[in-house]
Structure formats: structure tokens, C-alpha cells
């Protein structure tokens, strides 16, 4: 799966989970600062990403995933592994 395919799926999930317009979900968008996610939103989003990509995102890693691109990079590393 290419990084652009991963971004497309992440973008869809983030837009749905956070109830934001998909156009706002850019690689550099911060979940909390730009997309107004609270801590519960982030937990639910991480769970949705884990399910979609059939991966596990440890709590320590989830705390470091602050932007859409960080999520894409983490998932790309797991999917290719």
C-alpha cells in the first residue's frame, strides 16, 4: 500500500471521526490544534485506524502522533513491516 493510499484512508477516517470537512484534513494538520480533537476523539480515532489497517498503535506511539502526516508515517512503517 502506497503512502498516498494510506493518506487517503487516514483522511477519510479522521474526517469521519472528528466530524470535520475532509478538505481540512491535510498532512500538516494537527489533530488538536487544527481539527479541534479532544483526548477522547484521539483515542477513538486511533482505534478506528487500528481496525482499518489491522495494526496495533501502542499508547506511547499514539501520544507522539500529533498530525495527520505523523499518523500516515507510523501506519506506513507498520504496514510495510
From Swiss-Prot:
It comes from Acaryochloris marina (strain MBIC 11017). 4'-phosphopantetheine is transferred from CoA to a specific serine of apo-ACP by AcpS. This modification is essential for activity because fatty acids are bound in thioester linkage to the sulfhydryl of the prosthetic group. Belongs to the acyl carrier protein (ACP) family. The gene is acpP. GO terms for cellular component: cytosol; membrane. Residues 4-79 form the Carrier domain. Pfam families: PP-binding. This is Acyl carrier protein. The lineage of its organism: Bacteria, Bacillati, Cyanobacteriota, Cyanophyceae, Acaryochloridales. GO terms for molecular function: acyl binding; acyl carrier activity. The modification O-(pantetheine 4'-phosphoryl)serine is found at residue 39.
Amino acid at each position: 500500500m502506497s503512502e498516498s493510499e494510506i493518506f487517503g484512508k487516514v483522511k477519510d477516517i479522521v474526517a469521519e471521526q472528528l466530524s470535520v470537512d475532509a478538505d481540512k484534513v491535510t498532512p500538516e494538520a494537527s489533530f488538536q490544534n487544527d481539527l479541534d480533537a479532544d483526548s477522547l476523539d484521539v483515542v477513538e480515532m486511533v482505534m478506528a485506524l487500528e481496525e482499518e489497517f489491522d495494526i496495533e498503535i501502542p499508547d506511547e506511539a499514539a501520544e507522539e502522533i500529533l498530525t495527520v502526516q505523523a499518523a500516515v508515517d507510523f501506519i506506513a512503517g507498520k504496514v510495510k513491516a
